[in-house]
């Protein structure tokens, strides 16, 4: 029999899993997500990506501010769910909620645990230069991403990949992984393995103060920094335009030939010298503008060889 599930998630990363579980016949008893927030130029309240997907499924949507009250617990228990599936919900579940579903709560986490427990595993894996990452289904416990692991999928991280690329691959793989995990849970065959305590690292939330690019660092470190923060919050530098420093987010780049002083533009194609080589910018964004290719940018704003980037 299909399972009766409570789904808990918020961003676009969680949507494929919600839709896949519904498509495979599971009964989505309720969808928990974060409250609508003001966004866009008009700062109108916008529902989360998961809320919008839940409406398409005609599933009940709940946006509690807390799960730590007696009322919230009673409401959660009233769904009489077999299990809860949690994907980037953005709120810590108290033990009483974890204990409520008969078969437990299962989280889809975007790393190869125990590496990169915490809030920003996709960013940190790229920024650290990891050769691979992945997605795991774990049975949740009271710790921070410390639960027993059920299933995993891996992907390679190449120099060309940004957080967007990793996000999209893992969202698709994760949806399939959770469907398989719930199928195994349904038939009583889901096997769990305790996480190793060797190799534990924590993926701290990204701080905007980290975003400025330091071109004195080695080339590959600069590339990883840029791709690990793309598109949000976006690694940035300042280009002198019409005599004024203008902040530019660098969204994509590649390792290029050439040398110069760190931060020096060394050709007419927005190739910038780093500590031991250079990167060539391929996509960027000015404040208030849409992302554009470096070629498009240079057509309207030529940057001469020898200019220093701040």
Swiss-Prot record:
It comes from Rhodopseudomonas palustris (strain ATCC BAA-98 / CGA009). Disulfide bonds: none annotated. Its EC number is 2.1.2.9. (6S)-5,6,7,8-tetrahydrofolate binds at residues 111-114. This is Methionyl-tRNA formyltransferase. GO terms for cellular component: cytosol. Pfam families: Formyl_trans_C, Formyl_trans_N. The gene is fmt. GO terms for molecular function: methionyl-tRNA formyltransferase activity. Attaches a formyl group to the free amino group of methionyl-tRNA(fMet). The formyl group appears to play a dual role in the initiator identity of N-formylmethionyl-tRNA by promoting its recognition by IF2 and preventing the misappropriation of this tRNA by the elongation apparatus. It catalyses: L-methionyl-tRNA(fMet) + (6R)-10-formyltetrahydrofolate = N-formyl-L-methionyl-tRNA(fMet) + (6S)-5,6,7,8-tetrahydrofolate + H(+). SUPFAM superfamilies: FMT C-terminal domain-like, Formyltransferase. NCBIfam families: fmt (TIGR00460). Belongs to the Fmt family. Keywords: Protein biosynthesis, Transferase. Gene3D superfamilies: 3.40.50.12230.
């Amino acid at each position: 029999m299909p399972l009766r599930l409570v789904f808990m998630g918020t961003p676009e990363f969680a949507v494929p899993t919600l839709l896949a579980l519904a498509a495979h016949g599971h009964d989505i008893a309720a969808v928990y997500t974060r409250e609508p927030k003001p966004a866009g130029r008009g700062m109108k309240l916008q529902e989360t990506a998961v809320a919008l997907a839940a409406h398409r499924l005609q599933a009940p949507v709940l946006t509690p501010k807390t799960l730590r009250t007696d009322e919230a617990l009673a409401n959660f228990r009233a769904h009489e769910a077999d299990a809860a599936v949690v994907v980037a919900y953005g709120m810590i579940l108290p033990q009483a909620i974890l204990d409520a579903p008969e078969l437990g709560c299962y989280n889809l986490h975007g790393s190869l645990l125990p590496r990169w427990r915490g809030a920003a595993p996709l960013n940190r894996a790229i920024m650290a230069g990891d050769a691979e990452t992945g997605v795991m289904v774990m049975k949740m416990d009271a710790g921070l991403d410390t639960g027993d692991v059920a299933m995993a999928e891996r992907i390679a991280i190449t120099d060309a990949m940004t957080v967007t690329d990793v996000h999209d691959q893992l969202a698709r793989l994760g949806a399939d992984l959770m469907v398989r995990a719930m199928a195994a849970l349904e038939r009583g065959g889901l096997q769990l393995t305790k996480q190793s305590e060797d190799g534990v690292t924590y993926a701290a939330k990204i701080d905007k103060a980290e975003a400025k690019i330091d071109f004195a660092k080695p080339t590959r470190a600069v590339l990883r920094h840029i791709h690990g923060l793309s598109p949000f919050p976006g690694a940035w530098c300042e280009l002198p335009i019409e005599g004024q420093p203008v902040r530019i987010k660098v969204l994509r780049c590649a390792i290029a030939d050439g040398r110069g002083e760190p931060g020096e533009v060394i050709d007419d194609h927005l190739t910038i010298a780093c500590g031991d080589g250079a990167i060539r910018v391929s996509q960027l964004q000015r404040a208030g503008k849409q992302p554009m290719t470096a070629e498009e940018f240079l057509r309207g704003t030529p940057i001469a060889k020898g200019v220093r980037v701040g």
